From Swiss-Prot:
GO molecular function (one): structural constituent of ribosome
SUPFAM superfamilies per the UniProt record, alphabetical: Ribosomal protein L16p/L10e
Organism: Dioscorea elephantipes (Elephant's foot yam)
UniProt record similarity statement: Belongs to the universal ribosomal protein uL16 family.
Name of the protein described by the UniProt record: Large ribosomal subunit protein uL16c
Record text on subunit structure and interactions: Part of the 50S ribosomal subunit.
Signal sequence, start to end: none
GO biological process, one term: mitochondrial translation
Gene name of this polypeptide: rpl16
Location(s), subcellular: Plastid, Chloroplast
Keywords of this entry: Chloroplast, Plastid, Ribonucleoprotein, Ribosomal protein
Chain ranges passing through the membrane: none
Superkingdom classification of source: Eukaryota
Amino acid sequence: MLSNPKRTRFRKQHRGRMRGISCRGNHISFGRYALQALEPAWITARQIEAGRRAMTRYARRGGKIWVRIFPDKPVTVRPTETRMGSGKGSPEYWVSVVKPGRILYEMSGVSETVARTAILIAASKMPIPTQFVITG
């Protein structure tokens, strides 16, 4: 199921800039294997969910998966063929702002070959280049 915040303080947000590297969420905390972002990007809730589903499908019953990013930024879209002005568009979907170094998914309880394949399948769903990371 697509994730988005239950409630937010404001309906709309500025786009902002993605400068520098990730200073938080860049170490493996829960699992043994992880997928790490190498470039900055907005990752949509759909992409996060697609990656999670791909990993759980491949790992079957074995292993545990942690999703380390959450889509908390609303992206507004204006209706097509609308003239300029008359305010900002309405929130259409949610994204997670990801900087280089950020851990996207973590996994444990499976062999390294299974984890590597599952994480590579999830990586193919991501809009950015990523790398497979192991603790230790």
